């Protein structure tokens, strides 16, 4: 249900489920869930590893989006409240 809502808000067209914006939004949602989980379970190292993998994937997608569509990148990081990457800031 949450996934469909995220897809609907960030999709470019009605059947868009795989665009970069949608993928980053879904990863950001999962990152928020894992962060909340890790606040309660500090020693859950497998979840910490999973969180790091998700953050790396999101970082790669954001870098791709910055190269292909800088305006879309800026809009997305503002909507999601993500800080711009260090290597992407002039």
Swiss-Prot record:
Gene Ontology BP terms: translation
One example GO MF annotation: structural constituent of ribosome
Main location: plastid
Top-rank taxon, per record: Eukaryota
Disulphides: none
Protein's cellular compartments: Plastid, Chloroplast
Gene3D superfamilies given in the database record: 6.10.250.3130, S15/NS1, RNA-binding (1.10.287.10)
GO cellular component: chloroplast; ribonucleoprotein complex; ribosome
Family annotation (InterPro entries): Ribosomal_uS15, Ribosomal_uS15_bac-type, uS15_NS1_RNA-bd_sf
Keyword Ribosomal protein appears in the UniProt entry: yes
Keywords: Chloroplast, Plastid, Ribonucleoprotein, Ribosomal protein
This protein's record includes keyword Ribosomal protein: yes
Subunit structure as annotated in this protein's UniProt entry: Part of the 30S ribosomal subunit.
NCBIfam families xref list: S15_bact (TIGR00952)
Family from the record: Belongs to the universal ribosomal protein uS15 family.
HAMAP family in the record: Ribosomal_uS15_B
Protein name: Small ribosomal subunit protein uS15c
UniProt organism field: Mesostigma viride (Green alga)
Gene symbol of the encoding locus: rps15
